[in-house]
Amino acid sequence: DKAFNEALEVQRKMARDARDDKTGRPVIYNTRSIDLASLKVDEGAQGGKIAAMYPAHDAQPVESMEDGKKAAVITDVTAFHAEGGGQLGDTGRIIAPAGVMQVEITKKLPDGATIMIGTVTEGTVAVGDEVKFEIERGRKNDIARNHTATHLLHAALKQVLGDHVNQAGSYVGPDRLRFDFSHFSPVTEEELRRVEEIVNDQILAAKDVTIEE
């Protein structure tokens, strides 16, 4: 539908913004100056310190970025959850003493660092700034609900179609989810009805959700 296509185009645009201007390939940000082992992800963190900053489309670090510029930052600790496994990452704001950055994409780099990509919307944001985090909690909670729904859907598919059903891919966003799975034949209308019934019954049961790692 229209809303989905608009959201998809926003993600595509941001992905393009995070590509190298010269090669068109995803930017491999130069993190050699950072102590990667000291970086932390703490979803309860209220803020952190900017350890590195880049133009969104350039691998080489800079000291600061001004209003209107596309930027990418790494902080010593971050509360922003990176995208992964088909699930979108957190969005929100990074508030610096002299500026604000709107975070539109959060990714995990190949070296393990979490990087926040977006636009400086006010003033100047610089390396060394002590910053505060403002995560879009409503959006994050919507994504969490849809993440849980993929587990319910997977369990229901196994119950209706058989234990051979395995996840083959997924998309988890704030307004919808997609669950790809393996099966040897098309799902019938009756099987689909049963899957929907099982999932809806579990949702209506409003059971507590626990996280295990």
Where are these regions (language model features)?
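A glycine- and charged-residue-rich anion-binding loop/surface
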Residues: 1-213
